[in-house]
Swiss-Prot record:
This is Transcription initiation factor TFIID subunit 4. Residues 1-13, 66-112 have a biased composition (Polar residues). One of its GO terms (cellular component) is transcription factor TFIID complex. The keyword Transcription regulation applies. Residues 226-294 form the Histone-fold domain.
Length: 421
């Protein structure tokens, strides 16, 4: 009996195994068919997001995975399923009667679904890298790119159509504005013309006018410089016409200008140092000058009274002509020597005038007294306050020329001869 029971149990187990294997094979075939259909639809571009087809139902397994793809490639085909069936028939089952009954009850309650067999995972990465399910993340498709780009173009076209509408609205607004201004009595064209004219006038005022500065004239005239240089060249025994050489004439003129400028600046500096400690417009004389002037006036009055007494007594006529001649000769001699030294022929009027003319009119009142005093040469004490002359005087120019060695010797001697104290 035990032998028959075990054989019956083995027969039941093999039947259940065959049913499970056939169910697994049918499920795997359905899965492969669904995968092939999904791949064909992806290649033909039927997987757009805007399609109205209902999403595929996910096959729920007892492992708790939501994806339709198995996590591992089990490599189940029809050939392998047949081999597994033959192996299951040939090999006896390792389960006991208790385990098989529990396993069979669990399989019967699983609604035709079975657990996957323990098969080693495949090493083919290309199959794993290509997702076949619609759920989860997926790579972009060709048709999706085209659809997006075309949609973007349509959006751009729509957006490009908007500014045209805005431009038309702005034109209508401008026309309405012009109508309103025209009805108010404002001429837009005249206002624009006035605005442009005012802007142009402001620009012309802001720009400075071009100033045409004339050329600086030469310090010395070129003809005069050429004549002087020709004369100097003849003295040096060579003849050259400098009239055709304007650069040389300009150089000589500029050098003379610099020479004179240096002399004048030195003269001005010396005159300023000379007048530095003296107040030009003081308006007040010193007490010493006032006392000397009063003494000179008193001496002149005393001399006039003495001359009157001598004329009244008849004592003034003795040896007057000899004294006048002797004084006149002395003054003429001194004037001649000074003229020879200075090289000038000018003579002062008070030395050349004759002194005999006032004596011819003697005996006629106060004129005789003045003539007698003039004949005696006693005109009293001349008063002169010590004041510095304003500006540049001869002393300043001579002081500036004394520092120069070339061409200034004769000028200095003539200048000192002409100074009048």
């Amino acid at each position: 009996m035990s032998g028959t029971l075990s054989s019956n149990n083995n027969g039941i187990d093999t039947k259940n195994d065959n049913e499970n294997v056939s169910g697994n094979v049918n499920g795997n075939e359905n899965q492969t068919e669904n995968q092939n259909q999904n791949q064909n639809e992806n290649e033909n571009g039927t997987g757009n997001e805007s399609s109205n087809e209902p999403p595929m139902k996910k096959i729920k397994t007892e492992s708790g995975l939501d994806d339709s793809n198995p996590t591992f490639d089990f490599g189940i085909t029809t050939d392998s399923s047949s081999q597994n069936i033959e192996n299951s028939k040939s090999t006896p089952s390792e389960f006991t009667s208790d385990s098989t009954s529990a396993f069979d009850s669990a399989v019967k309650n699983s609604d035709g679904l079975s657990l996957p067999k323990s098969v080693a995972p495949s090493t083919d990465l290309k199959k794993d890298a290509i997702p076949t399910s619609n759920s989860g993340l997926a790579l972009p498709k060709k048709n999706e790119k085209k659809g997006k780009t075309t949609g973007g173009k349509n959006v751009n076209k729509k957006e490009s159509g908007k500014p045209g509408a805005k431009g038309s609205q702005s034109q209508t607004d401008a026309s309405k504005m012009s109508d309103v201004l025209f009805s108010a009595g404002v001429d837009i064209r005249e206002e624009e013309a006035l605005l442009t004219s005012s802007v142009a006038a402001s620009k012309t005022q802001s720009q400075p006018a071009a100033v045409n500065i004339p050329e600086h004239p030469p310090f010395l005239h070129p003809d005069q410089v050429a004549a002087f240089m020709k004369k100097a060249s003849k003295e040096q025994n060579f003849n050259q016409n400098f009239a055709k050489q304007g650069e040389i004439l300009q150089m000589i003129s500029s050098s003379c200008e610099n020479y004179m400028r240096d002399i004048i600046t030195n003269t001005i500096v010396i005159s300023r140092h000379r007048r530095k400690a003296v107040k030009v417009n003081s308006g007040r004389r010193s007490e010493v000058a006032i006392a000397l002037k009063s003494i000179a006036i008193q001496q002149k009055k005393d001399e006039e009274r003495r001359v009157k007494k001598r004329i009244a007594l008849g004592l003034e006529k003795e040896d007057t002509e000899n004294k006048i001649d002797s004084e006149e000769t002395l003054h003429r001699a001194s004037n001649a020597t000074a003229g020879l030294r200075a090289g000038s022929k000018k003579q002062y009027g008070w030395l050349t005038s004759s002194t005999n003319k006032p004596l011819a009119a003697t005996g006629k009142g106060a004129g005789n007294i003045a003539a007698a005093i003039a004949a005696r040469g006693d005109t009293g004490l001349r008063f002169r306050e010590a004041r510095e002359e304003p500006g540049i005087v001869m002393r300043d120019l001579l002081n500036a020329l004394e520092n120069r060695r070339i061409g200034s010797h004769n000028i200095i001697t003539k200048g000192y001869a002409r100074i009048r104290d």
